[in-house]
């Protein structure tokens, strides 16, 4: 092989090597993008929460809040029943439902407190609107199934779709809405389920006063690792006036309160 042919051969080989390196870099970058997408999980208990608005990593293991270790409270009190991704709805739970406006239902034990709270909120000049309350097992199953179908339509496998769906819709049996003691309230002039909701007149009033009526903000901004749910400034849970006052004054979530922290 003469010198010129050797030079041409080396140049072609360098070009081929560079092309191979670029190809490997491309596939590595693509793999990282896919992995990053799958690891991100906008955890919300509300199906109308737009994916990506609140993005956090879901807890992989149950947080260190054992449930009911606080000796000062009654672990069997229905006010404090814990339902989250680690504690499913009790099998014998049967809410006594009564109708609300717009077709929603709620447990009769918190009906009067809810109506009074909303009336007083309106008297302050705000315009609260209930956008979700009790959900049956069937309703929750349909919501979850629809979310799975949405991911299947995007090309994910069944297993991947179910995992991704669980990051956005509570698995049936683990949604607090199935208790009948939880309600989602928005401002009639701003009905988006995002963090901007907290700045509305309705949420400003509820954040300061809901505890007076036995309701707590169930998913505070800084408690996601404990609740398993991202910040939801619209989601309120009835626990009774005594417990609500105590939880509000301590600045804890329900999981912390039950653990005695």
Identify the role of each PLM range.
Residues 2-261:
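Extracytoplasmic cell-surface/polysaccharide-interacting catalytic and binding patches
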């Amino acid at each position: 092989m003469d010198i010129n042919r050797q030079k041409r051969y080396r140049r072609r080989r360098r070009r081929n090597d560079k092309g191979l390196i670029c190809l490997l870099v491309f596939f590595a970058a693509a793999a990282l993008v896919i992995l990053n997408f799958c690891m991100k999980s906008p955890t919300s208990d509300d199906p109308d929460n737009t994916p990506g608005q609140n993005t956090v990593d879901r807890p992989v293991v149950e947080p260190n809040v054992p449930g009911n270790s606080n000796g000062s409270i009654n672990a069997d009190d229905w006010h404090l029943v814990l339902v989250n991704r680690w504690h499913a709805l009790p099998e014998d739970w049967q809410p006594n439902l009564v109708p609300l406006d717009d077709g929603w239902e709620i447990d009769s034990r918190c009906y009067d407190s809810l109506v009074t709270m909303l009336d007083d909120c309106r008297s302050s000049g705000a315009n609260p609107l209930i956008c979700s309350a009790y959900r049956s097992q069937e309703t929750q199953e349909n919501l979850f199934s629809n979310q799975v179908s949405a991911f299947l339509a995007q090309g994910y496998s069944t297993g991947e779709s179910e995992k991704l769906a669980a990051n956005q819709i509570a698995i049936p049996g683990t949604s607090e809405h199935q208790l009948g003691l939880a309600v989602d309230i928005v401002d009639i002039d701003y009905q988006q389920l995002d963090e901007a909701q907290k700045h509305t007149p309705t949420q400003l009033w509820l954040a300061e006063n809901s505890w007076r009526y036995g309701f707590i903000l169930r998913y505070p901004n800084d408690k996601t690792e404990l609740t398993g749910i991202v910040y939801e400034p619209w989601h309120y849970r009835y626990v009774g006036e005594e417990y609500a006052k105590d939880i509000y004054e301590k600045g804890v979530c329900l999981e912390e309160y039950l653990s005695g922290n």
